[in-house]
């Protein structure tokens, strides 16, 4: 086993709150346990999930204080007992879940995947959460094929951008992206049909652009009543993917009122109606995906 030496710096959320709560602290170097690797972190991704963790809205977060950081890219500097899939010096991307905002992090070796030398750490650190989630939804769950249509909410965000790129690669015939007006040019630069989320009804747009049928796939990170409207945008046989709860977040601090409104407005889907319309509703949370073979397959495909 590789023993920890010296100290490292890491970011800590000591309690729920605004950005003023963020701390940088020193701690002992970690030592990889059996089945783990230790990674020197070169880059770490910043996601909406980390914002929700700080505000106390992320249900699977550890108790405070804790170190956030869902995804990292770096090099292996140590292995615990029984690890033979990786070696010192390997360049990897890793789904850390928590703890990634540190100079070094130990994690289950099955959640670290080697990357080619041609892929920079800058790019690699953005793969696990945004592109992993997008790939899992459209390719693994949705089995998307050329010519299908897609609705993307928060289209200018990390997952929205990744979904749009995957749609283009898979040959989608129409990609509709909702966002605020200032983001129109960016959304359209990715090949999407822009919908102003404040001034247009995306359900009507989806129906009008598909001869009244609706889209094949709808990507919703909002929740609440918004999720039901996304469902109404689907055609028969369509698929809805729910992977976030942005409706619960307003500004830089936790809002109990926003949380209540989101959960109160959550739809209840009738299995009989799902069956009769051949529709599907998926809940997606890559951080809680327990099948490492699926997860690693996604990362391996995306990093090449």
Question: What label would you give each PLM region?
Answer:
Residues 125-200, 204-205:
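Mid-domain Rossmann-like dinucleotide-binding core that forms the NAD(H)/NADP(H) cofactor-binding site
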Residues 209-217:
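A glycine-rich helix->loop->beta "capping" turn
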Residues 89, 147, 191, 214-215:
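Local beta-strand N-terminus motif with an aromatic residue
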Residues 28-46, 57-99, 221:
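Glycine-rich beta-strand-centered segment in the early N-terminal region that forms part
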Residues 40, 52, 63, 91-154:
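NAD(P)H dinucleotide-binding glycine-rich loop of Rossmann-like/cofactor-binding domains
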Residues 172, 225-303:
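Glycine-rich phosphate-binding loop and adjacent beta-alpha segment
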Residues 80-85, 177-186, 198, 224-226, ...:
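Short glycine/proline-centered loop/turn elements that form peptide/ligand docking sites
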């Amino acid at each position: 086993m590789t023993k920890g030496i010296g100290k490292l710096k890491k970011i800590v959320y000591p309690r729920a709150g605004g950005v003023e709560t963020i701390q940088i602290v020193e701690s002992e170097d970690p030592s990889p346990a059996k089945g783990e690797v230790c990674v020197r972190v070169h880059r770490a991704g910043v996601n909406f999930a980390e914002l929700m963790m700080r505000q106390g809205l992320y249900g699977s977060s550890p108790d405070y204080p804790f170190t956030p950081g869902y995804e990292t890219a770096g090099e292996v500097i140590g292995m615990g007992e029984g690890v033979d899939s990786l070696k010192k010096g390997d360049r990897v991307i890793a789904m850390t879940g928590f703890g990634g905002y540190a100079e070094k992090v130990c994690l289950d070796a099955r959640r670290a995947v080697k990357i080619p030398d041609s892929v920079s750490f800058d790019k690699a650190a953005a793969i696990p959460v945004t592109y992993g989630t997008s790939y899992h939804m459209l390719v693994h769950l949705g089995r998307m094929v050329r010519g299908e249509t897609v609705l993307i909410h928060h289209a200018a965000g990390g997952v929205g951008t990744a979904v749009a790129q995957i749609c283009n690669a898979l040959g989608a015939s129409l990609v509709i992206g909702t966002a605020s007006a200032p983001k129109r040019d960016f959304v359209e630069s990715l090949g999407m049909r822009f919908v102003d989320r404040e001034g247009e009804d995306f359900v009507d747009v989806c129906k009008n652009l598909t001869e009244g049928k609706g889209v094949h796939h709808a990507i919703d990170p909002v929740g609440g009543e918004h999720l039901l409207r996304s469902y109404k945008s689907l055609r028969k046989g369509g698929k809805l993917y729910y992977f976030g709860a942005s409706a619960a977040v307003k500004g830089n601090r936790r809002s109990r009122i926003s949380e209540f409104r989101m959960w109160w407005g959550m739809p209840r889907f009738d299995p009989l109606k799902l069956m009769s319309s051949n529709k599907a509703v998926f809940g997606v949370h890559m951080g809680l995906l327990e099948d490492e073979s699926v997860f690693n397959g996604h990362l391996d495909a995306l990093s090449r």
